[in-house]
Amino acid sequence: KKSFVTKHNYSLLRLTINSNEFHDEKNYLIEISIKDNSKKIQNLNFKIKVHHTASIPKLIDSNFFYTNWFNINKMEEKHTLKRWSDKWYKMLEKYAKIMADGRQNCIIIPGELISLKNNKIHLDEDKMISFINVFRKNGFKYFESPHLLGRGKNDDWGSPELITNLRGRGYFSEEAKKDIDTIIRKIKKFTKKNNLTNQWLQHIADEPTDNNAECYKQVSKQIRAIYPEIKIMEATNAKESLNGAIDFWCPIINDFQENEEFFRSREKIGEKVLIYTCLVPGGKWLNRTLDMERIRQVYFGWAGSKYNTFGYLHWGLNQYKADPFKQSVVKHPSPIASPTNYLPAGDTHIIYPGKDGPLSSLRFEAHRKGIEDYELLEILKSKNKRKHSKIVKKLFLDYENYSTSISKYRRIKRKLLKSL
């Protein structure tokens, strides 16, 4: 028996029980008593049915790729930390653990670790491997590089030329090409030395378009000439114009669903496809904003199993633009955003800064539940594809058509567990 005492009029409590606590395949009863000055107000009873025939693989063994982009500046700001200090690493461990508990298995590398030192490009190998090792220890499988180029300070979506993030040089200049050459050679040396070749995912520029696709392809060609084994991954807006430049495609879900034939053609030649959402799409499309049903986040795992996609990406683990406890809708940060362009509720984050570390959220836990469902569905698929398809169709048809009935979800989930 455990007790918790609060002096506040209103409290939100979360009960988490490790599955290792359940040793036998039977029913368990959990009773929660709510009291006021020793006077019982209400009893809450929860029944748990254990299915030992079903098991979730360890994070390192998961085949579902999942990344939420992590902002170390916000971690430091919210917890008053000095970068690279002992306290900083202890807090980083807490953030790595909460991500791992949510089934996240990829982390983006801080951009500052590739910097200018005495006007020369420097990759801080010691700090980079110390950062990576915190996440390795927690079962992370993939590591995303910082983006090497972008649309420049003015966020120019119409320009055909990408701009280097380090020095602000247009890629078509010889100086920019030399910078990319230097960075990739340093990345190659670092990843080979630390046995990261198969875990390193190289970003070039976020959301390339038809306008800058030719430039993007030239960068990709240069990188592969230096480091042929490297895998290039990108959240994409363009399609055919980027053919041959990307190994891991990451279209937004409506782009994937409306152009599935194109992405299947890329898979046939050995490329992978995962999906992402951000401030869009809205309506009935799956997304994870605060004003949507939690069941939508669960279905990202079901979609992965139905479509055989590689995983899911989102830009907002903790990209706070305001106090997340007070304001969930914020102005779009782009310098070219119109005065009425706002990010939807909760788009910037899915965890919260607590007093002593990060706090999970219902959305984050729903997403975790969906990825765990993915693992179970994949086991069933390997045993009985027909039954797998039948179970998925009872809840999820596509990214716009799915059941929002929690009772139906639980009923079908029980069928899934019994099928294993």
Predicted regions and their residues:
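Glycoside hydrolase catalytic-domain groove-lining segments
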Residues: 182, 243-281
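Short, glycine/acidic-rich beta->alpha junctions
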Residues: 24, 90-91, 123-127, 215, ...
